């Protein structure tokens, strides 16, 4: 606790540069992430360009803070750098990337998400479908229609049904009419997930 508060204090007292943030610990509590975000906001009222290095850091905590900063300031420049982080080995970074894509409404991420969704963990797939529910197009609805029957996990199927229902309720109804289990899932999504 003392060490983490000392790190936050150090960040508050120094300028926000790569040299000063390099000693940030690999794991930071959510509370300290909020404190760091507050410090950055109070020091810089607009997007701090000097913090672009965070997304290319080796430190997972700094990458996640960099993504949160991008989302907070609605900074959409260099989206390729954000999308490349979908391939980061840390699942927590991948999850933060999905949150950032969702908050920034990066529709250009749709193709990449559809390309990689099935090769990732259950948690990633669920979060990915929730993200696609906001940024997806007909490509996403067609992808779900084509793949829903091969998805074995019920939670992932529910997320896919939620996604298609958000994007195109008519297509969701048509898809659900092909299978009793999908009908039940669609009904569940409409009543419980709303």
Locate each region found by the language model.
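Amphipathic alpha-helical scaffolding segments comprising HEAT/armadillo-like alpha-solenoid repeats
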Residues: 1, 14-27, 44-56, 75-87, ...
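Alpha-helix N-cap/helix-start positions at coil->helix boundaries
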Residues: 3, 7, 29-34, 45, ...
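Alpha-solenoid HEAT/ARM repeat scaffold
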Residues: 7-11, 30-37, 64-65, 80, ...
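Core register positions within helices of long alpha-helical scaffolds
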Residues: 9-15, 38-42, 69-72, 100-103, ...
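Alpha-helical adaptor scaffolds
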Residues: 91, 95-99, 103, 107-118, ...
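Ankyrin-repeat and related helical/solenoid repeat scaffolds used for protein-protein interactions
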Residues: 122-166
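Terminal, low-structured helical/coil segments at or just beyond the last alpha-helical repeat
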Residues: 176-194
């Amino acid at each position: 606790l003392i060490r983490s508060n000392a790190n936050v204090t150090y960040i508050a007292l120094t300028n926000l540069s790569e040299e000063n943030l390099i000693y940030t610990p690999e794991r930071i509590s959510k509370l300290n992430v909020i404190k760091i975000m507050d410090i950055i906001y109070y020091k810089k009222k607009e997007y701090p360009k000097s913090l672009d290095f965070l997304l290319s850091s080796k430190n997972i905590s700094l990458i996640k803070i960099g993504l949160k900063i991008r989302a907070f300031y609605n900074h959409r420049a260099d989206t390729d750098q954000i999308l490349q982080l979908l391939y980061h080995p840390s699942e927590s970074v991948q999850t933060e990337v999905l949150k950032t894509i969702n908050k920034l409404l990066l529709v250009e991420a749709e193709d990449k998400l559809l390309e990689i969704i099935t090769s990732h963990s259950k948690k990633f797939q669920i979060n990915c479908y929730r993200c696609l529910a906001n940024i997806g197009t007909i490509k996403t609805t067609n992808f779900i229609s084509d793949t829903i029957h091969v998805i074995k996990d019920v939670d992932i199927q529910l997320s896919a049904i939620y996604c298609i229902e958000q994007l195109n309720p008519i297509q969701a109804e048509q898809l659900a009419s092909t299978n009793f289990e999908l009908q039940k899932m669609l009904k569940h999504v409409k009543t419980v997930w709303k």
